[in-house]
């Protein structure tokens, strides 16, 4: 069986005016983190998926946990396409992973020197 790694990019916009809306926002964000999503920017998350079947299952779980208010946009790309993403920013941030490697160490504290 061959696997085609995919990356689900999820963008959402939810109101946070009332206490109830903020609670719904926190609940949805907590759900995303529990499902293995990684935050790229505020309200932009991604998750590595094994194949199209895993993608379909994740979409089903997202539909089951869809907040009542707000918009959610999902874009699925191959891992190779995701690795070609271009980051534009001011100071260089080395904690962002953008690689085709299967094992990536996140953060500034990793060093392979002894």
Curated annotation (Swiss-Prot):
Q: What happens when the gene is disrupted?
A: Plasmid transformation is still inhibited.
**Which top-rank group of organisms is this from?**
Bacteria
Q: Cofactors per UniProt? A: Mg(2+)
Q: Does the keyword Nuclease apply?
A: yes
Q: What biological process terms from GO does the record include? A: defense response to virus; maintenance of CRISPR repeat elements
- What Enzyme Commission number(s) appear in the record? 3.1.-.-
Q: Which UniProt keywords apply?
A: Antiviral defense, Endonuclease, Hydrolase, Magnesium, Metal-binding, Nuclease
One of the entry's Gene Ontology molecular-function terms is:
RNA endonuclease activity
Query: Any idea which positions bind Mg(2+)?
Result: 13
InterPro entries given in the database record: CRISPR_associated_Cas2, Virulence_VapD/CRISPR_Cas2
Instruction: Give the first-level EC class, as a single word.
Output: hydrolase
Q: Which Pfam families match?
A: CRISPR_Cas2
Task: Report the leader peptide range.
Answer: none
Q: Which family does it belong to?
A: Belongs to the CRISPR-associated endoribonuclease Cas2 protein family.
Q: Which NCBIfam families match?
A: cas2
Q: What does this protein do?
A: CRISPR (clustered regularly interspaced short palindromic repeat), is an adaptive immune system that provides protection against mobile genetic elements (viruses, transposable elements and conjugative plasmids). CRISPR clusters contain spacers, sequences complementary to antecedent mobile elements, and target invading nucleic acids. CRISPR clusters are transcribed and processed into CRISPR RNA (crRNA). Functions as a ssRNA-specific endoribonuclease. Involved in the integration of spacer DNA into the CRISPR cassette. When the CRISPR3/cas system consisting of cas9-cas1-cas2-csn2-CRISPR3 or just cas9-CRISPR3 is expressed in E.coli it prevents plasmids homologous to spacers 1 or 2 from transforming.
Q: How does it assemble?
A: Homodimer, forms a heterotetramer with a Cas1 homodimer.
The protein's name in its UniProt record:
CRISPR-associated endoribonuclease Cas2
Q: Give the originating organism.
A: Streptococcus thermophilus
- Gene name tied to this protein: cas2
């Amino acid at each position: 069986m061959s696997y085609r790694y995919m990356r689900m990019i999820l963008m959402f916009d939810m109101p946070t005016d009332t206490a109830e809306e903020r609670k719904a926002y926190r609940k949805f964000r907590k759900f995303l983190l529990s499902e293995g999503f990684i935050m790229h920017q505020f309200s932009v998350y991604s998750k590595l998926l094994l194949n199209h079947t895993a993608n379909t299952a994740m979409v089903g779980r997202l539909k089951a946990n869809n907040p009542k208010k707000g918009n959610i946009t999902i874009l699925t790309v191959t891992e190779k396409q995701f690795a070609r993403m271009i980051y534009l920013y001011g100071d260089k941030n080395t904690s962002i992973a953008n690689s085709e490697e299967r094992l990536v160490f996140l953060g500034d504290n990793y060093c392979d020197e002894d």
